[in-house]
Swiss-Prot record:
Keywords: ATP-binding, Carbohydrate metabolism, Glycogen biosynthesis, Glycogen metabolism, Nucleotide-binding, Nucleotidyltransferase, Transferase. Homotetramer. Belongs to the bacterial/plant glucose-1-phosphate adenylyltransferase family. This is Glucose-1-phosphate adenylyltransferase. GO terms for molecular function: ATP binding; glucose-1-phosphate adenylyltransferase activity. The gene is glgC. It comes from the Bacteria. SUPFAM superfamilies: Nucleotide-diphospho-sugar transferases (SSF53448), Trimeric LpxA-like enzymes (SSF51161). It comes from Halalkalibacterium halodurans (strain ATCC BAA-125 / DSM 18197 / FERM 7344 / JCM 9153 / C-125) (Bacillus halodurans). Pfam families: Hexapep_GlmU (PF24894), NTP_transferase (PF00483). PANTHER family: GLUCOSE-1-PHOSPHATE ADENYLYLTRANSFERASE (PTHR43523:SF2), GLUCOSE-1-PHOSPHATE ADENYLYLTRANSFERASE-RELATED (PTHR43523). GO terms for biological process: glycogen biosynthetic process.
Length: 383
C-alpha cells in the first residue's frame, strides 16, 4: 500500500554520557517526565502529525524498548497497513552487520521503505525531548521544492560544537554545513530531523554504502555530499522547546523544566498529547503527614513525607519524615523514613534505607543511584 511519507526513527543509541541510566537500556528507552520514556515524544509527534507508518531502528540493549513499543497501540500505530515496525540490524543472504552509522541504518532497511513506495522519508532521532508538528515541516519542504530539509534551532554559541552547524541565505537554503565543528560558523544547529525525497536519498545511500572510507553518517557524509552536488537543501526553523538529553545534567534539567510553569514544555496540552503505555496502577495516596509542592506525582505513589520540585514515577513510596528536593524517582522506588534526597536521580526499583542522606558533593552536580548501590547511613558522592 503506497504511503506519501514513511517515518524512520533512529532508536539504537547507547547514550554513553548518561552513564548508569543507559547501562542496561537504549537511550530512547530511558524514563522521563514521571510516566514516559524518551521515545514517546517522537512517536507521539508522528501520531499527532498524521504520520501512520513508522519504522523504529533498534540496536543497543533493545529488550525494554521492544517491550514498550509492542504493536504500537498507545500511539494508534497498531495498523494492518503501516503502523509501527521495530527494525533490528538487517541480515541479508550475503551477510550483515551492526549499523555502521545513521545513514547505514537507513540503507540496511531500505526494503522496508520501498514496500510503501513513498515520495518522502522523515528521519528522526529517538533521544530528544520536544513537541513538533512534522506536517508543517513537510509542507515547508514541498513549498520550497527541496531535495532535503533539515529542522534547525539556534543553540548557545558555547554548545554549537556539539551539533551539525549550518549557514543559510534569506530563502533558508543551506549554503554551508559542518558536523560538530571545532570552530562553529554559526549557532544554527541541526536537530537531527530530516525530510528527504526518497528517490534522491536512496541513490545517495547506495553510493555511500560502496565507499569503505565513509563513516556512513548523515551529518558527516550524506548532507555534505548533497551540498557538493548543488542539491537544494533547506532549513526549517523550529522555535519550540527542544532538548538533547545526552548528559545526566541535561536529562535532569529537562525533567525540572516540566515543573516550571513558564516552560514551553507542557504535558497537559490536549491538542498535542504525549502518549505512552498505561501502567494501570491505583490512584496516588498523599497522607495527612505529607507535604507536596511543585511536583509531578504519578499513579500508584504513596507519600508520607515531603516532596518539593521533584518527579515521582508510578509506584514510588516515600516514608514518614523523609524529604525529597529537586529529584527524579523512577518507577517502584522505595524511600524509607527520615531520608533526605537532594538533586538525585533514583533508578527503577531502588530501595533507599531509612536514615540515608543523598546529595552530590558538588551542589551543581546530579547524583545517580541505582538498585545495586550499597548504602551507609550518610552518603555524598560526585557524579
Amino acid at each position: 500500500m503506497k504511503k506519501e511519507i514513511v517515518g524512520m526513527l533512529l532508536a539504537g543509541g547507547e547514550g554513553k554520557r548518561l552513564g548508569q541510566l543507559t547501562r542496561k537500556l537504549a537511550k530512547p528507552a530511558v524514563y522521563f517526565g514521571g510516566k514516559y520514556r524518551i521515545i514517546d515524544f517522537p512517536l507521539s509527534n508522528c501520531t499527532n502529525s498524521g504520520i501512520d507508518t513508522v519504522g523504529v531502528l533498534t540496536q543497543y540493549e533493545p529488550l525494554a524498548l521492544n517491550g514498550h513499543i509492542g504493536i504500537g497501540s498507545p500511539w494508534d500505530l497498531d495498523r494492518r497497513h503501516g503502523g509501527v515496525t521495530v527494525l533490528p540490524p538487517y541480515i541479508e543472504k550475503q551477510g550483515g552487520s551492526w549499523y555502521k552509522g545513521t545513514a547505514d541504518a537507513i540503507y540496511q532497511n531500505r526494503y522496508y521503505i520501498e514496500q510503501y513506495d513513498p515520495e518522502y522519508v522523515l528521519i528522526l532521532s529517538g533521544d530528544h525531548i520536544y513537541k513538533m508538528d512534522y506536517d508543517r515541516m513537510i509542507s515547508h519542504h514541498k513549498k520550497l521544492g527541496a531535495d532535503a530539509t533539515i529542522s534547525v534551532i539556534e543553540v548557545p554559541w558555547e554548545e554549537a560544537s556539539r551539533f551539525g552547524i549550518m549557514n543559510t541565505n534569506e530563502e533558508m537554503t543551506i549554503t554551508q554545513f559542518e558536523e560538530k565543528p571545532t570552530t562553529p560558523i554559526s549557532n544554527l544547529a541541526s536537530m537531527g530531523i530530516y525530510i528527504f525525497n526518497w528517490s534522491v536519498l536512496k541513490s545517495y545511500l547506495i553510493q555511500d554504502a560502496k565507499q569503505a572510507n565513509s563513516s556512513h553518517d548523515f551529518g558527516k557524509d550524506i548532507i555534505p555530499k548533497m551540498l557538493a552536488k548543488d542539491l537544494k537543501l533547506v532549513a526549517y526553523p523550529f522555535e519550540g522547546y527542544w532538548k538533547d538529553v545526552g548528559t545526566i545534567k541535561s536529562y535532569w534539567e529537562a525533567n525540572m523544566d516540566l515543573l516550571d510553569e513558564h516552560s514551553s514544555l507542557m504535558l497537559n496540552d490536549p491538542s498535542w498529547r504525549i502518549y505512552s503505555v498505561n501502567r494501570n496502577q491505583p490512584p496516588q495516596y498523599i497522607s495527612t503527614r505529607a507535604y507536596v509542592r511543585c511536583s509531578l506525582v504519578n499513579e500508584g505513589c504513596v507519600v508520607h513525607g515531603n516532596v518539593e520540585q521533584s518527579i515521582l514515577f508510578p509506584g514510588v513510596h516515600i516514608g514518614a519524615n523523609s524529604s525529597v528536593f529537586e529529584s527524579v524517582l523512577m518507577p517502584n522506588v522505595k524511600v524509607g523514613e527520615n531520608v533526605v534526597l537532594r538533586r538525585t536521580i533514583i533508578m527503577e526499583g531502588a530501595c533507599i534505607p531509612s536514615g540515608t542522606h543523598l546529595a552530590p558533593s558538588d551542589p551543581d552536580d546530579i547524583l545517580v543511584i541505582d538498585k545495586d548501590t550499597e548504602f551507609s547511613p550518610s552518603i555524598a558522592a560526585n557524579q
